[in-house]
């Protein structure tokens, strides 16, 4: 026997269904599990993220935040609509287009940042612009007039990295636009920056701000690493300083120009993951001085042998724990590294 089930919102993208004692049980990709009996139904929603997380993760005041988005190796869209996951006091909240029609157009969330003044969420969509999530599930989307459209893709507003500085200015990587670095200042005004280097596809992604308020930016697609100091004032462009770091002594000494990630450790050192290992900047205060600052390559010891840390491996993400140890995600697994980078503690 067949049954026609028509409950608006109960089923959106069903995967499996069974009939038990004439009751229907339907597993749905977005609506979890539903039990239909007679003219009523119940939904069983799992206390979990809606899907796996591929984007950024952070913790602020015992609340965990993660973005689900990702891009292809060539920085093309994945059309991932899973959104943002928040874990607070043991309960998960999934914020995405399937739950809120107001953000239906926002896909591929990559970067995330928390405004410490009001603990609201800012998240970057790779193509859909910048999203501000306010209490009560109120949403504000920034695109035209604030962000720049992608060159060659004029309806796309790509946000690939976010970071607040100590003055509560929100720095934004506007990947692929003519001015790929933007800032929303603490007073709500905006400013955009033209990067004074030729960059393939004007690619700018992750942003990390160091102890000297310098902005470190991953420039993927083989462009290397960018550093920016706005000087005494964001509005005064005449004392701005820029550096583009890459391979070679005196030029940054990175293991590769194919930079994948950056992280700041407890000493203020900047750890840079590339497609060919790790470099560490331990002299960040000299970055814009005449002598500059080159990365050192940590040497890891394994018995009677020693080699450069993750040489020949693609380093995709680096996180620093409370003991200053480094958690490193590579294409070959996850590793826990000692604070100085000279010992592999665990491999997963």
Regions inferred by a protein language model and the residue ranges of each:
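Carboxylate-rich, polar loop motifs that coordinate divalent cations or form catalytic acidic clusters
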Residues: 1-348
């Amino acid at each position: 026997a067949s049954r026609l089930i028509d409950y608006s919102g109960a089923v959106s993208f069903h995967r499996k269904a069974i009939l038990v004692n004439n009751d229907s049980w339907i597993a749905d990709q977005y609506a979890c599990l539903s039990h239909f009996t007679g003219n009523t139904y119940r939904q069983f929603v799992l206390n979990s993220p809606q899907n796996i997380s591929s984007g950024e993760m952070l913790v602020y005041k015992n609340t965990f935040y993660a973005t689900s988005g990702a891009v292809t190796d060539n920085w093309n869209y994945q059309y991932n609509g899973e959104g943002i996951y928040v874990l607070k006091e043991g309960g998960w909240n999934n914020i995405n287009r399937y739950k809120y029609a107001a953000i239906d157009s926002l896909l591929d969330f990559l970067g995330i940042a928390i405004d410490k003044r009001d603990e609201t969420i800012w998240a970057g969509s790779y193509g859909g612009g910048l999203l501000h999530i306010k209490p009560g599930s109120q949403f504000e989307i920034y695109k035209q007039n604030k962000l720049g459209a992608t060159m060659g893709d004029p309806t796309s507003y790509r946000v690939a990295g976010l970071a607040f500085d100590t003055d509560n200015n929100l720095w934004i990587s506007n990947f692929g636009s003519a001015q790929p670095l933007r800032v929303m200042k603490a007073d709500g005004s905006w400013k955009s920056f033209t990067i004074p280097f030729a960059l393939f596809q004007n690619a700018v992604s992750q942003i990390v701000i160091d102890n000297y308020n310098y902005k470190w930016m991953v420039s993927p697609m083989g462009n290397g690493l960018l550093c920016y100091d706005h000087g005494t004032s964001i509005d005064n462009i005449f004392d701005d300083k820029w550096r583009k770091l890459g391979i070679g002594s005196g030029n940054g000494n990175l293991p590769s120009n194919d930079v994948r990630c950056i992280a700041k450790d407890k000493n203020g050192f900047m750890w840079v993951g590339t497609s060919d290992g790790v470099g560490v900047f331990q002299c960040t205060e000299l970055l814009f001085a005449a002598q500059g600052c080159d990365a050192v390559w940590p040497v890891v010891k394994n018995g009677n042998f020693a080699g450069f840390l993750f040489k020949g491996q693609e380093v995709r993400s680096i996180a620093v724990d409370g003991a200053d140890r480094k958690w490193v995600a590579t294409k070959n697994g996850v590793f826990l590294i000692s604070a100085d980078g000279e010992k592999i503690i665990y491999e997963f």
